[in-house]
A protein has these predicted regions:
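Long alpha-helical, hydrophobic tracts
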Residues: 3, 7-9, 14-17, 54-69, ...
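Membrane-proximal helix-loop-helix units in multi-pass membrane proteins
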Residues: 62-133
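Hydrophobic alpha-helical transmembrane segments and adjacent interfacial helices
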Residues: 20-24, 44-55, 72-79, 97-111, ...
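Residue-level signal for well-ordered alpha-helical segments
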Residues: 1-4, 57, 111, 115-118
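Cytoplasm-facing juxtamembrane segments at the starts of transmembrane helices
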Residues: 28-41, 81-97, 117-125, 138-160
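N-terminal topogenic module of multi-pass integral membrane proteins
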Residues: 1-54, 153, 167-182
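Generic local-structure boundary detector
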Residues: 31, 35, 51, 77-79, ...
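Aromatic/pi-system hotspot detector in well-structured domains
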Residues: 12, 19, 114, 126-133, ...
Length: 182
């Protein structure tokens, strides 16, 4: 297995757990503290993976993963310590811009380099995550009543943009990077 793709699969799988758990929490199906602990654990684990990607020369991928990790550190503090979520809401606005840029980057890269055309999927995933973060901004920072929509989008994206592609990467059924060596 190519180490880079395995690391991306690992990160996608872990982030999928967080998306699913956060969605269930927003629907009132789980306790905030237990999902806060999950957010903290995943933030630490994907930060380590991001550092490994950085040492392999994939700093852009490491930065994308680090943006997720920062969200999860903040969510852990909100869920476990009861902090206000407005700051997270404003971070989500910034994150929306970051994920839109990555969506463009991955889609353009996959179009320009046919050997790695599969990275266009990461562009689609980033666009989906940007939508989620934009709705979270409206909900958390501006107080719009979109919590249920955000919860269901978390759950849907947990499967479609994270669990399924993560498992495909981990089981070597998908090779979007064309075998980039690590």
């Amino acid at each position: 297995m190519v180490p880079v793709e395995a690391l991306f699969g690992y990160v996608l799988l872990l982030v999928g757990f967080v998306f699913f758990g956060n969605g269930l929490t927003l629907l009132g199906k789980t306790g905030a503290k237990e999902i806060g602990v999950l957010n903290l654990a995943v933030a630490v684990l994907i930060s380590i993976a991001a550092w490994k990607l950085h040492t392999l020369g994939l700093t852009a991928g490491a930065a994308l993963i680090s943006a997720f990790a920062l969200v999860y550190f903040m969510v852990a503090a909100i869920f476990c310590l009861g902090y206000d979520a407005k700051g997270l809401g404003w971070y989500c606005l910034f994150g929306t811009v970051v994920f839109l840029w990555y969506a463009y980057h991955f889609y353009a890269l996959g179009t320009a380099v046919p050997a790695i055309a599969g990275v266009k999927w990461f562009g689609i995933f980033c666009a989906a995550w940007a939508l989620l973060l934009l709705l979270a901004f409206f909900t958390l920072a501006l107080g719009k009543a979109l919590g249920t929509a955000v919860a269901y989008l978390f759950i849907i994206e947990a499967f479609l943009t994270l669990l399924i592609p993560g498992m495909l990467l981990l089981t070597e059924k998908w090779n979007p990077l064309g075998g980039v060596p690590g």
